[in-house]
Design a protein with these regions (language model features):
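Non-heme di-metal
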Residues: 1-180
Length: 180
């Protein structure tokens, strides 16, 4: 990704803080919406969600200014690096501190989440490799492909350019997986 024009300035720090603040507000408001819905306040839940969507757009605006959004390859690489930091440094350090301060249950949660973050990194790196080796929609062996729009199933080494049932483009195909 390109460097941002604010590098090293107070404005860059302000943009980073604005991005973090808007991102946190968005998440909080989605949690608050769930509580309001459970308590029977549909309108309030909807307003929390509407505001959360606004906060998401504010955060996106600041993140774009920071040149934080690239193409999919760049985004996958950045996501993998972020997940790597979380599991190798952040959560490990948090767990050690929690343990030292007498919070072993919280330390265990930090470590458990760290393991999940490691899986996230592996997933992003695998997806990045698929793009780099042109294997997103074509594999060396026969696979089962499913259209994410209509559910049409195709067996072969490559997803069709266009779904023969719903006419959606190849980008709607993924490897079919049963999880039940």
């Amino acid at each position: 990704m390109a460097a941002n024009k604010y590098t090293g300035t107070q404005t860059e720090k302000n943009l980073q803080e604005a991005f973090a603040g808007e991102s946190q507000a968005r998440n909080k408001y989605t949690y608050f919406a769930s509580v309001a819905k459970k308590e029977g306040y549909e309108q309030m839940s909807a307003l929390f969600l509407k505001t959360a969507d606004n906060e998401k757009e504010h955060a996106k605006m600041w993140f774009k200014e920071l040149a934080g959004i690239g193409d999919t390859k760049e985004n996958l690489a950045a996501a993998a690096e972020g997940e790597n930091y979380e599991w190798t440094d952040m959560y490990d350090g948090f767990a050690k501190t929690a343990e030292e301060e007498g919070f072993p249950e919280l330390a265990a949660k930090f470590r458990a989440v760290g393991k999940i973050e490691k899986h996230h990194e592996e997933r992003y790196r695998a997806l990045l490799k698929n793009i780099e080796t042109a294997q997103v929609f074509e594999k060396s062996e026969v696979k089962v492909w499913e259209c994410r729009n209509c559910g049409h199933i195709v067996v072969g080494t490559k997803a069709p350019e266009v779904c023969p049932v719903c006419a959606h483009p190849q980008s709607y195909f993924e490897l079919h997986a049963e999880n039940y």
